[in-house]
């Protein structure tokens, strides 16, 4: 899949990004290189290959030392709701604005 310069300019327009012609051409080259890489990766036959949870272990016989999942923040809902004018069951109460 290759993009044309008009595609890049249209995408920039839709994203409300102002680009010069030089920037658009540079972006076009980068995007086409990226799409070329994706096409190369999609062409590789990966049948029979198991996905790796930790790819580093496939290169070296090591295990990654991952930290334990631990709660680092306490529940401060009450502290945050204390200055609110009105709360109920942990929710902020606001005036009705749509009838």
UniProtKB/Swiss-Prot annotation:
Keywords: ATP-binding, Ligase, Nucleotide-binding, Protein biosynthesis. It is an enzyme of class 6 (ligase). One of its GO terms (molecular function) is glutaminyl-tRNA synthase (glutamine-hydrolyzing) activity. Its EC number is 6.3.5.-. InterPro entries: Asp/Glu-ADT_sf_sub_c, GatC. One of its GO terms (biological process) is glutaminyl-tRNAGln biosynthesis via transamidation. It catalyses: L-glutamyl-tRNA(Gln) + L-glutamine + ATP + H2O = L-glutaminyl-tRNA(Gln) + L-glutamate + ADP + phosphate + H(+); L-aspartyl-tRNA(Asn) + L-glutamine + ATP + H2O = L-asparaginyl-tRNA(Asn) + L-glutamate + ADP + phosphate + 2 H(+). It holds the Pfam family GatC. PANTHER family: GLUTAMYL-TRNA(GLN) AMIDOTRANSFERASE SUBUNIT C, MITOCHONDRIAL (PTHR15004:SF0). Belongs to the GatC family. Allows the formation of correctly charged Asn-tRNA(Asn) or Gln-tRNA(Gln) through the transamidation of misacylated Asp-tRNA(Asn) or Glu-tRNA(Gln) in organisms which lack either or both of asparaginyl-tRNA or glutaminyl-tRNA synthetases. The reaction takes place in the presence of glutamine and ATP through an activated phospho-Asp-tRNA(Asn) or phospho-Glu-tRNA(Gln). Heterotrimer of A, B and C subunits. HAMAP family: GatC. This is Aspartyl/glutamyl-tRNA(Asn/Gln) amidotransferase subunit C. It comes from Cupriavidus metallidurans (strain ATCC 43123 / DSM 2839 / NBRC 102507 / CH34). The lineage of its organism: Bacteria, Pseudomonadati, Pseudomonadota, Betaproteobacteria, Burkholderiales.
């Amino acid at each position: 899949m290759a993009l044309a310069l008009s595609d890049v300019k249209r995408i920039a327009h839709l994203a409300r990004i102002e680009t010069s012609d030089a920037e658009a051409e540079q972006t076009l080259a980068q995007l086409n290189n990226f799409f070329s890489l994706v096409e190369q990766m999609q062409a590789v036959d990966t049948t029979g290959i198991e996905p790796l949870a930790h790819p580093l272990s496939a290169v070296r016989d090591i295990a990654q030392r991952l930290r334990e999942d631990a709660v680092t923040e306490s529940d401060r809902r009450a502290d945050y709701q204390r200055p609110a004018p009105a709360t109920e069951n942990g929710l902020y109460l606001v005036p009705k604005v749509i009838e």
